[in-house]
Amino acid sequence: MAAFADLDLRAGSDLKALRGLVETAAHLGYSVVAINHIVDFKEKKREIEKPIAVSELFTTLPIVQGKSRPIKILTRLTIIVTDPAHCNVLRATSSRVRLYDIVAVFPKTEKLFHVACTHLDVDLVCITVTEKLPFYFKRPPVNVAIERGLGFELVYGPAIRDATMRRYTISNALNLMQICKGKNVILSSAAERPLEIRGPYDVANLGLLFGLSENDGKAAVSTNCRAVFLHGETRKTAFGIISTVKKPRPSEADDESLPVCKKAKCEG
């Protein structure tokens, strides 16, 4: 099986608390984690900050439980979009956005969900779990997102903390599974404290409550997560690629512009 991953450890101003989250994840057997910086443009003067450098957290990375290698720490940016204008930062080649390994979008309306699935250059689409779903999922945009290699993220942290959130999480997850059939789904903790992280096998079992099959539940904490950060690598690389088009030689261009009958005479 691919390495286990939790792609949503919440970044805060307290580096000591963040170190505790990463250490706990390593102890539970996660090989990869992502530190998630969330930007909500509804709040005044919110800007995309530079991601936290791994060197700020650790001089020596924690070793993954049961492995001989250190944990891998990725950086993630999640942008909450409530207005189409908020998507502009994702359409442009923003230098700050490019600094992050994973870029996620949290659409709050059906229209924005459709745009996220079909057009935005992101790696993850976040699904709300803290309130009743404000719209119904439709198959066309979900299928386009799957074809584009985007992941759908469900977080289990709120379901652990609150009974009402648990109902919302399960209900919204089941609605998603009816459409995507478990494809490209990842499960993350959204943990702010170490006690909110669960072991990968427990999370995979939790996926059964969300409508995932046993195999899809395991993939949601392993292979699907790997696909997400590989998608991020491809996205970042694509920014640096300049495509070139071979121009035809003048004689070739002239030949192409001639009618077929005249070309035949010339060749004769």
Curated annotation (Swiss-Prot):
GO terms for biological process: rRNA processing; tRNA 5'-leader removal. Its main location: nucleus. GO terms for cellular component: multimeric ribonuclease P complex; nucleolus; ribonuclease MRP complex. InterPro entries: Pol/histidinol_Pase-like (IPR016195), RNase_P_p30 (IPR002738). GO terms for molecular function: ribonuclease P activity; ribonuclease P RNA binding. Gene3D superfamilies: Metal-dependent hydrolases. Keywords: Acetylation, Nucleus, Phosphoprotein, rRNA processing, tRNA processing. It is found in: Nucleus, Nucleolus. The modification N-acetylalanine is found at A2. The modification Phosphoserine is found at S251. Pfam families: RNase_P_p30. Belongs to the eukaryotic/archaeal RNase P protein component 3 family. Component of nuclear RNase P and RNase MRP ribonucleoproteins. RNase P consists of a catalytic RNA moiety and about 10 protein subunits; POP1, POP4, POP5, POP7, RPP14, RPP21, RPP25, RPP30, RPP38 and RPP40. Within the RNase P complex, POP1, POP7 and RPP25 form the 'finger' subcomplex, POP5, RPP14, RPP40 and homodimeric RPP30 form the 'palm' subcomplex, and RPP21, POP4 and RPP38 form the 'wrist' subcomplex. All subunits of the RNase P complex interact with the catalytic RNA. Several subunits of RNase P are also part of the RNase MRP complex. Component of ribonuclease P, a ribonucleoprotein complex that generates mature tRNA molecules by cleaving their 5'-ends. Also a component of the MRP ribonuclease complex, which cleaves pre-rRNA sequences. This is Ribonuclease P protein subunit p30. It comes from Mus musculus (Mouse).
